[in-house]
């Protein structure tokens, strides 16, 4: 008996994670394939294309130009140049309901 593989044509949900860092740095990480690949945008509007990389713990994405982001439990490191780490923190929007 052959089993049919069900293929879904619905696009994957886009996931977005925002980070903040020193000197008003903001970083947006966006992926539609569960962070196998991602687009990282900094607050100057520059876009970096990253792919999943090996990490001991947490999630790490990098490209061949030395750009990387590595994060776990809301804390992380971003490198726009190899060996120049910048500490970042995940920024979650707080919804305030006026009463």
Language model: regions and residue ranges:
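Cysteine-centric segments in proteins
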Residues: 2-99
């Amino acid at each position: 008996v052959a089993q049919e593989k069900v293929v879904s044509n619905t696009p994957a949900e886009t996931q977005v994670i925002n980070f903040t860092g020193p000197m008003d740095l903001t970083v947006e990480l966006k992926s539609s394939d569960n962070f196998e690949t991602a687009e990282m945008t900094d607050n100057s509007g520059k876009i970096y294309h990253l792919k999943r990389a090996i990490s001991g713990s947490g999630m790490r994405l990098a490209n061949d130009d030395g750009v990387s982001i590595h994060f776990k439990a809301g804390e992380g490191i971003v490198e726009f140049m190899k060996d120049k780490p910048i500490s970042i923190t995940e920024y979650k929007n707080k919804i305030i309901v006026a009463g």
